[in-house]
């Protein structure tokens, strides 16, 4: 089987992709799930600097691979796309929302995240997650401004409504910065679209792969 690497979001689990993975298998692809640093199977991965994060990413995913990335994992894949040089990059509901929507500061975000991890006794290293959040968010660069040179499919949820409107407006404002990016909203989905509608998400991915890779075996 061919392979896609799947970079998780914060709080995502391997179990969450089970139906998505089955649908991917139907198209001849296996999915290798990767927890972000500080989380679950990668709880002991320490990130102290941007270089640590780049080295971790490079050790997990070979250059030129097919990559799917969700939420915080999407922010990682987008920011460090030049190190991945992905053959095909699929972004699931990430790389587009900044603090201007959430109306909070980086410090507030980190405090809330650490409290959530502690209160729910999650198998995470709160300090590593906090550092990861700081690295990605202190000087946030969205998908339209990182200079993507990789064929990229951005799949976005359309709920809740106020986030949907934010996304549509951001796309409209950045219509001149969309080289290499194809965008599709998944109807009647919220953030974890691959959990809610695994078949529809996978079908959208492979429709796109067929259109953009019609002369290759993707």
Located regions from the model:
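Catalytic histidine-centered segment of alpha/beta-hydrolase-like enzymes
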Residues: 189-198
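Conserved loop-alpha-helix segment in the C-terminal half of the alpha/beta-hydrolase fold
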Residues: 156-189
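Flexible "cap/lid" loop of the alpha/beta hydrolase fold
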Residues: 78, 89-117, 167-170
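Conserved HGGG/HGGXW glycine-rich cap/lid loop of the alpha/beta-hydrolase fold
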Residues: 1-41
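Gly/Ala-rich beta-loop-alpha elbow adjacent to hydrolase catalytic centers
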Residues: 69-77
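Active-site nucleophile elbow and catalytic-triad environment of alpha/beta-hydrolase enzymes
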Residues: 128-145, 167-168
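Short beta-strand/loop motif that positions the catalytic acidic residue
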Residues: 148, 154-156
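Active-site loop/oxyanion-hole signature of alpha/beta-hydrolase fold enzymes
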Residues: 32-66
